[in-house]
Design a protein with these regions (language model features):
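Short secondary-structure boundary/capping segments
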Residues: 6-7, 33, 53, 101-102
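Charged, amphipathic alpha-helical segments
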Residues: 1-3, 48-51, 93-95
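Charged, gly/pro-rich active-site loop segments
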Residues: 72-137
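A generic "binding-loop/recognition-motif" signal
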Residues: 47-48, 115
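Short beta-strand segments
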Residues: 12-47, 55, 61-66
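Extreme N-terminal tail/first-helix region
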Residues: 1-15, 137
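Helix-adjacent hinge/juxtasegments
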Residues: 51-82
Length: 137
């Protein structure tokens, strides 16, 4: 993955997650930590929350991470596709290192393993986009 994409993902902390809930679209905002070794967002969610129930039933998800700005020249963000699954022990460590206060809540954690990312960064040139796709094995 291009370092410009990774740098943006590292500096942000909130994503918008889109899932299908019984065939209907549903969105949720999630704080995230990022597993750079596996290129996965790590998010928390209660097992009874709508977005978790939805991606446990249909693990293909999509989402965005965007810089909040009204200045066109500073627009920056990613759109992504991913597969959701329970987080590994190592991913739990990554999440709690970023959000140590979450330990007290003992949340269920999930990894959104990236399969495709489109990064828009107008500071690189208006409408400049970088696309990354995971190699198929």
């Amino acid at each position: 993955m291009d370092e410009k994409i990774l740098k943006f993902i590292r500096k942000m902390h909130l994503l918008s997650l889109a899932v299908l809930d019984d065939g209907k679209p549903y969105c949720a905002s999630c704080f995230y930590a990022f597993d750079e070794d596996n290129l996965a967002f790590i998010v928390a969610g209660g097992e009874q929350s709508a977005h978790v129930k939805a991606f446990l039933a249909e693990p293909c998800v999509a989402g965005t991470v965007a810089l909040d700005t009204k200045i066109v020249g500073k627009i920056e963000g990613v759109q992504f596709r991913a597969l959701a699954a329970p987080a590994t022990a190592q991913q739990r460590k990554i999440y709690f290192a970023r959000f140590p206060y979450a330990l007290a809540m003992n949340p269920s954690l999930y990894a959104l393993s990236l399969s495709w990312v489109k990064f828009t960064h107008n500071a690189l040139g208006f409408g400049k986009k970088l696309v990354w796709q995971r190699e198929q094995i």
